[in-house]
Curated annotation (Swiss-Prot):
GO terms for biological process: cytolysis in another organism; monoatomic cation transport; pore complex assembly. It comes from Hydra vulgaris. SUPFAM superfamilies: Cytolysin/lectin. Residues 1-17 form the signal peptide. Pfam families: Anemone_cytotox (PF06369). A motif (Cell attachment site) lies at residues 158-160. InterPro entries: Actinoporin_PFT, Anemon_actinoporin-like, Cytolysin/lectin. Composed of a long N-terminal alpha-helix and a core region rich in beta-sheet structures. Before the pore formation, the alpha-helix binds the lipid membrane, partitions into the lipid-water interface and stabilizes the monomeric molecule on the membrane. Finally, it traverses the bilayer, thus forming the transmembrane pore. This is Hydra actinoporin-like toxin 7. Transmembrane segments: none annotated. Pore-forming protein that forms hydrophilic pores and causes cytolysis. Compared to equinatoxin-2 (AC P61914), it reveals lower cytolysis activity (5-12-fold difference, tested on erythrocytes), a larger pore size (probably 2-3 nm) and different affinity to membrane lipids (100-fold lower affinity to sphingomyelin). Binds to sulfatides. Shows cytolytic activity on HeLa cells, with a different potency than its paralogs (from most potent to less potent: HALT-4>HALT-6~HALT-1>HALT-3>HALT-7>HALT-2).
Amino acid sequence: MLLYVCLVNLLLPLSDGAVNPELVGVLVKVGVDAALQQIDEVWKGSTVRDWKCAVENKSNKTLYAMGTTPESGSMTTILDDIPPENTGIFVWEKSRGAATGAAGVVHYKYGNKVLNLMASIPYDWNLYSAWANARLSDDKVSFSDLYYGQNGAKSATKGGNWGEVDGTKFFLTSKSHAEFKVIFSGK
């Protein structure tokens, strides 16, 4: 199986000698599990809350990166386009020093539609749970709409369960360093 890995930036050491998990997007022509394992080998972050996502594009069109809508934290990798039959990877971390989780929406252009992927990893597991959602729509969808299942969005799926919406199958683990697996068929 061909493996295409595009690393635009490597782990950058901070002035105090610690490792800074500033990585680039990784584009891999393998399955979701192999892609997540690949990023584990290069990303050695020490954040309290984060989620890494592998988006497997099983459609016949390229998913064009459109950016993010942060709720808490931000993407720490470059969001790349994902050609058909390829897998794109990115990492989202909580804001450093803040008592918040890691939550936001990633947007990809798919033809004349937008694929919106939402994940939320809580700061306090005693009060909150991990949630994920997806929606293929005409425009970008807000975090709030995806989290609460409003304005046409389906209800979010609790971490530890498979969800399926608009040709998108996804699974978010319920742990502080979560894995968000997304399989997009475009159907």
